[in-house]
Swiss-Prot record:
PANTHER family: COBALT TRANSPORT PROTEIN CBIQ. It is a multi-pass membrane protein. Pfam families: CbiQ. It comes from Rhodobacter capsulatus (strain ATCC BAA-309 / NBRC 16581 / SB1003). It is found in: Cell inner membrane. Forms an energy-coupling factor (ECF) transporter complex composed of an ATP-binding protein (A component, CbiO), a transmembrane protein (T component, CbiQ) and 2 possible substrate-capture proteins (S components, CbiM and CbiN) of unknown stoichimetry. Subcomplexes composed of CbiMQO can be isolated from membranes but the CbiN subunit is not isolated in association with them, suggesting it is only loosely associated. Expression of just CbiMN in E.coli confers some cobalt uptake. Keywords: Cell inner membrane, Cell membrane, Cobalamin biosynthesis, Cobalt, Cobalt transport, Ion transport, Membrane, Transmembrane, Transmembrane helix, Transport. It comes from the Bacteria. This is Cobalt transport protein CbiQ. The chain crosses the membrane at residues 26-46, 65-85, 112-132, 141-161, 224-244. One of its GO terms (biological process) is cobalt ion transport. Part of the energy-coupling factor (ECF) transporter complex CbiMNOQ involved in cobalt import. The complex confers cobalt uptake upon expression in E.coli; can also transport nickel with a very low affinity.
Length: 244
């Protein structure tokens, strides 16, 4: 799943025009809860709430979300499996408290991952950067982030074009050819990336770039009622996670 696909779904989604403050409060607020409240029931309640916002509120397609989540959740599962075993003088065995630690890790990290995926699939990067500008983040940092973000798309397009060309020439027919073709892509990607960066710099200079790239944003103001409801829900989950 490419970064461009995620940004496209966020730009075309149901919550595309929701105020940025509301989406950030949901994503970052629940993320803070996920890493602070006890894994059970706090992190579980965070996961349920953020998935409800994702699928029932924002209507993010389930199949697309699963395709995006499979890699981080798969990595999480592998990391949790390591906690189940230990290597000692007697060899490999089940670690004491291993299942409990693995379960706590899975619950807490899954909740945090779902929060970040909510923000990624509902908020385009341009909106996040324009929000940072309104929050008085230094313009230099915003411009570096914006140029880096756009350059990632350029690199992805270059790599995809090179891989497609290799497949058309049967460069992936066997495992040996695949390894050789992949090495060639990696070796050729850096010179192409530097060339594209040079052309990008020349284009910006030709347009009299003064160190700031403005992005048009017409987002409505956040509703105090909606913000209050979100905070109330988060406070309820915090209380449940601490008291239960």
């Amino acid at each position: 799943m490419s970064i461009a696909s995620i940004d496209r779904v966020a730009a075309q989604g149901r919550w595309r025009n929701r105020p940025l403050a509301e989406k950030c409060l949901i994503g970052l607020g629940f993320l803070a809860l996920a890493v602070t409240v006890p894994p059970f029931p706090g992190a579980v309640l965070v996961t349920v709430a953020i998935l409800a916002f994702t699928f029932l509120g924002a209507r993010v397609p389930l199949r697309f979300w699963a395709a995006v989540a499979v890699l981080p959740l798969g990595f999480l599962t592998t990391g949790a499996a390591v906690l189940l075993i230990q290597i000692g003088p007697d060899g490999i065995g089940l670690a004491p408290q291993g299942p409990a630690k693995a379960a706590a890790l899975v619950m807490r990290a899954s909740a945090a991952t779902c929060c970040l995926l909510f923000l990624a699939t509902t908020t385009p990067a341009a909106d996040l950067l324009s929000g940072l500008r309104r929050w008085r983040v230094p313009a230099e940092l915003i411009e570096i982030a914006l140029l880096t973000y756009r350059f990632v798309f350029i690199l992805a397009e270059e790599a995809a074009a090179m891989t497609t060309a290799q497949r058309a020439r049967l460069g992936h027919a066997t495992r040996r050819r695949w390894l050789r073709s992949t090495a060639q892509v990696i070796a050729a990607l850096l010179p192409r990336a530097l060339d594209r960066a040079r052309r990008l710099e020349t284009g910006l200079a030709a347009r009299n770039w003064q160190g700031e790239m403005r992005v048009l944003s017409t987002r409505p103001a956040a509703s105090p009622l909606v913000l209050g409801l979100i905070l109330t829900l988060q406070a309820a989950i915090l209380a449940a996670g601490v008291l239960l």
